[in-house]
A protein has these predicted regions:
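A short beta-strand-to-alpha-helix junction
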Residues: 33-38, 86-101, 135-143, 153-170, ...
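Loop/turn elements at helix/coil->beta-strand transitions in domains of secreted/extracellular proteins
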Residues: 1-3, 52-59, 114-120, 143, ...
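A long, amphipathic alpha-helix that forms part
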Residues: 40-47, 77-118, 175
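Catalytic-site neighborhoods of secreted/periplasmic enzymes
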Residues: 1-45, 132, 202-205, 238
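Histidine-centered active-site microenvironments of extracellular/periplasmic hydrolases
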Residues: 16, 107-157, 164, 212, ...
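Short, solvent-exposed turn/loop segments enriched in Gly/Ser/Thr/Pro and often Arg
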Residues: 4-14, 62-68, 122-130, 134-135, ...
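Active-site His/acidic residue clusters
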Residues: 42-91, 126-136
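C-terminal cap/loop subdomain of S1 sulfatases and analogous C-terminal strand-loop tails that border
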Residues: 28, 128-131, 154, 166-169, ...
Length: 294
């Protein structure tokens, strides 16, 4: 049994196989976006139903938190009364609100006696930079992948291995005893050897408003490649023409080709493309070999 709650941009969740859902959400509206803000009850009811039917379950909790509207409960907002910027105070309270709901969900798993037999993955879609979801730089694309599975995963922190969101599906399938199909990209994150063998990671950044559903290259802004200490950001010559959102949001900030030494310059302040043309060419060749639109 599978449940989707929260944000979903691809029509109705049942079209991709969810057995249960809160309905379509559209972009910034819909009943499903009430999850977390109003109640966690739809998730708790679903878990109860799965237990009653003695079936394994999958829950996708995608709350519209800490997204706008920034309307945190007063009990949380009061904790940040000393923050001078009212907008920042509200945002901090929104983050704590999200944190609360995640804690409530974890507590519910314990209450139902399934916490030790449930793999929990916490993901985010952008990094910590202002308007970070649009940046091809590290403070935009570095996001948390936190896993919790008592008895199966030992607590640790790893900031060095190359991991991508495409690894989530093969990880969940393997954990559930399902062999991922050979055509599925990504690696099983529970297999440390497989993760360590990954030498290259590719990233792509698209326009906020999709230009074409069938031709993804028309919406492309940047292509990036990371291998070893090197990272190349290749800006598309004729990107989609949309108005930047300010704060650098999908706004070109550098040269067409930017090469960074992430070991010596983790904040990507020095473009070394002209000093190392051979590295640029190597990474461009890798990108072109990876980017094949079917």
């Amino acid at each position: 049994m599978t449940l989707h709650t929260g944000k979903y941009w691809m029509g109705h969740p049942n079209q991709v196989g969810f057995t249960d859902d809160m309905g379509p959400t559209g972009r910034h509206g819909g009943k499903a976006l009430s999850i977390g803000r109003k109640s966690m009850k739809p998730i708790y009811d679903f878990i109860d139903k799965a237990q009653q039917q003695e079936k394994p379950f999958f829950v996708w909790y995608a709350p519209f938190l800490p997204h706008t509207p920034h309307n945190p409960p007063d009990r949380l907002l009061r904790k940040y009364a000393e923050v001078k910027n009212p907008g920042n105070a509200k945002y901090l309270a929104m983050i704590e609100w999200l944190d609360e709901t995640c804690g409530e969900l974890m507590s519910q798993l314990k209450k139902k006696g399934v916490a030790d037999n449930t793999l929990v993955l916490y993901l985010a879609d952008n990094g910590w930079n202002e308007y970070g979801k649009a940046h091809p730089y590290e403070n935009g694309v570095r996001t948390p992948v936190i896993a919790h599975w008592p008895g199966k995963i030992k607590p640790r922190k790893d900031e060095h291995q190359l991991v991508s969101n495409i690894d989530v599906v093969p990880t969940i399938l393997t954990a559930a005893g399902v062999k991922p199909p050979p055509s599925l990209p990504g690696v099983n994150l529970l297999n440390q050897q497989a993760v360590a063998q990954r030498e290259t990671l590719f990233l792509s950044n698209f326009a906020h408003n999709m230009v074409s559903a069938t031709e993804p290259e028309k919406s492309l802004w940047t292509q990036s490649c990371i291998t070893g200490k090197w990272k190349l950001v290749a800006w598309i010559k004729n990107p989609p023409k949309i108005k930047p959102w300010g704060g650098g949001h999908r706004k070109k900030t550098g040269a067409d080709l930017e090469l960074f030494d992430l070991h010596a310059d983790p904040h990507e302040t020095k473009n070394l493309a002209q000093a190392h043309p051979e590295v640029v060419q190597d990474l461009l060749t890798r990108i072109n070999g990876w980017w094949k639109v079917d």
